[in-house]
Amino acid sequence: MAIQDEMRQVAEGAREASRTLSRMPTEIKDRALKEMAERLLQQAGWLMQENEKDVAFAKNLGLSPAMIDRLTLKESTIRDMADGILEVASLPDPVGKVTSMWRRPNGLLVGRMRIPLGVIGIIYESRPNVTADAAALCLKSGNAVILRGGSEAIHSNIAIGRLLKDVLKETSLPEAAIQVVETTDREAVYELLQLEEYIDLIIPRGGEDLIRAVVRQSRIPVIKHYKGVCHVFVDADADLEMAAKICLNAKIQRPGVCNAMETLLVHREAAPRFLPELARKLRESHVVIRGCEETCALISDAEQATEADWYREYLDLVLSIRVVGGIEEAMDHIARYGSLHTESIVTNDYANAQRFLNEVNSSTVLVNASTRFSDGFQLGLGAEIGISTTKLHAYGPMGLEELTTTKFIVYGNGQVRT
């Protein structure tokens, strides 16, 4: 079958499944989700065997350590996937929820009710866990999903997808509610992006090149999950011990993820007391520092940062550091170089904390906490579909409610328009 026909068949199946799924009772969806979580744990050994094929191929291709880290499935990763699905099952079902009601002067009772978006296409790279997370969120929110992962994770994605579909076959849920595109042919992505009559939304997750290509080619609305140039600003009166703990966690715990800190901004008054000791701790973890002139004067082995470095999402053990004159300069830097993802301020100044929260326009803004908390699971949303940097429809970590929209419902007793 030609790729064009195959993708149309997939999309037609998803559209039909979405109609059935949208009216499924919460109990049936939750029962299926719990069984999916159990199935992942039961088949963890097989999943890791399939994943090893992808990891070996990725190493032969010379993919970066950050890419390989995101690609690798371990027992702990699979357990986290299962926990994420169980968390989704435990959350309230947004479908059918009436968010507000009001009465008009003519007696009409008007309200808003949450409904699924319909069919969602997700295009992603190197992250097999997205297959499980996205499938769970879409199922619970009543959406059919078409999942197209990167060629580097094809064995892992197919394996996870088949386990999830096996559960659907054992329930009254439509089998086409979850579909993994099993071809690595790039033409499949292009063909999916043309099917606006079947697919309601496209969510790309991956590198800049992928996201730009999807936005350029798609005839379907796109919510971008763009790069994470995340900042931490250490204020003049910050608790420096706490600041060091936050910075080390934000940079070192998992440098290859989008909510890792990429640029550190330090108030000029705190820099001499803070940066030399922080640099020593960063050095122990093999972090390369690229700094402004003032940073290089305080850290002897720091490399001179270029203009391009301030825009860069390293996804690696590399950190840009700039010394700034205060909160105004820090916020100006974030506004110029940031990617609207996640920013944190470390401060004991309440006014500065509130100003940072109010004026920094990124999708997640934190006070005295690591950027690593910009995550659906950590914020109580359950597994997330991703972190949107598109302000229209959804902004920040996307959980269940962000995968629904609202329709107007109106109760009357014979009113007619005059």
From Swiss-Prot:
PANTHER family: DELTA-1-PYRROLINE-5-CARBOXYLATE SYNTHASE, GLUTAMATE SEMIALDEHYDE DEHYDROGENASE. One of its GO terms (molecular function) is glutamate-5-semialdehyde dehydrogenase activity. InterPro entries: Ald_DH/histidinol_DH (IPR016161), Ald_DH_C (IPR016163), Ald_DH_N (IPR016162), Aldehyde_DH_dom (IPR015590), G-glutamylP_reductase_CS (IPR020593), Glu-5-SA_DH (IPR012134), GPR_dom (IPR000965). Catalyzes the NADPH-dependent reduction of L-glutamate 5-phosphate into L-glutamate 5-semialdehyde and phosphate. The product spontaneously undergoes cyclization to form 1-pyrroline-5-carboxylate. Its EC number is 1.2.1.41. Belongs to the gamma-glutamyl phosphate reductase family. It catalyses: L-glutamate 5-semialdehyde + phosphate + NADP(+) = L-glutamyl 5-phosphate + NADPH + H(+). This is Gamma-glutamyl phosphate reductase. It is found in: Cytoplasm. Residues 1-22 are annotated as: Disordered. Keywords: Amino-acid biosynthesis, Cytoplasm, NADP, Oxidoreductase, Proline biosynthesis. Residues 1-18 have a biased composition (Basic and acidic residues). One of its GO terms (cellular component) is cytoplasm. Pathway: Amino-acid biosynthesis; L-proline biosynthesis; L-glutamate 5-semialdehyde from L-glutamate: step 2/2. One of its GO terms (biological process) is L-proline biosynthetic process.
